Amino acid sequence: DRSVSRGLGDVYKRQIMDYSIRDAKEAGFNKVVFIIRKDIFEEFEEIIGSRIKDQIDVEYVFQELDDLPEGFEVPEGRTKPWGTGQAVLCCKDVVKEPFVIINADDYYGKEAFVKLHDFLVSGEDLGREFTMGMAGFILKNTLSDNGTVTRGVSVVDENGLLSQVHETTGIMMGEDGKIKCDLPDVQEWISPEDKVSMNMWAAYPEFLEFLAEDFKTFLSEVEEGDLKKEYLLPNIVDKLLKEGRANVKVLETQDRWFGVTLSLIHI
């Protein structure tokens, strides 16, 4: 992933971003914030941003390994990015409105954008410190013909609220028509009809304020010598659920996913 032409210049990925931004704009969103590395900015802007800015307002923020809170340093030998939680945190100073988080190389379909937009503008209060939304895809609609996938396998209560999310690797459809995965506990109950997170979340600016403090907690708990631990959105949301600080409305979408890194679109 050292080369923009290899990592971002490929036509397929550009088309996915074009479709997602078109769908977001049609749903009512009016700005996109691209979260990228600073060293690819010029080529990214030339290949993608220059076309997109004629359709929708565009801003950029940079996710860098050394963009850490005061008092923290990058562990010697670490090269792996800090994860999707830090990526979204990078937007704190430019996003002051309700927003939706997406992966730039996943195509989500129109329905998810419409449902999350309408949820945000409704101002629905779910009764806890943080009100959030999640696009709930049907697991069988998000499988790949090219191997296993990682999904946030979700448990949804009778009120349509997220009660648990399990970041699960190695998901595939077995020859017997049953879902297989790497987590033994999840394997006991996982089914093709389960709702899964595709990292498409709806939130309000106060969530970014929370990330700013919680990222410090995460960094303080990284064990010495661990050069790969990541600050990931599904784990962050699961933590808020377990602490009783958030309610997350699951908005089901029947659209089929396809994908080929993190972007944020807001109202």
What is the role of each PLM region?
Residues K110-W201, P205:
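Conserved core of the sugar-phosphate nucleotidyltransferase
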Residues L65-E70, K140-T142, I171-M173, W257-F258:
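A short acidic, often aromatic-flanked loop/helix-cap motif at beta-alpha or helix-coil junctions
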Residues I36, A202-A203, T261:
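A conserved hydrophobic position in a structured secondary element of the catalytic/binding core
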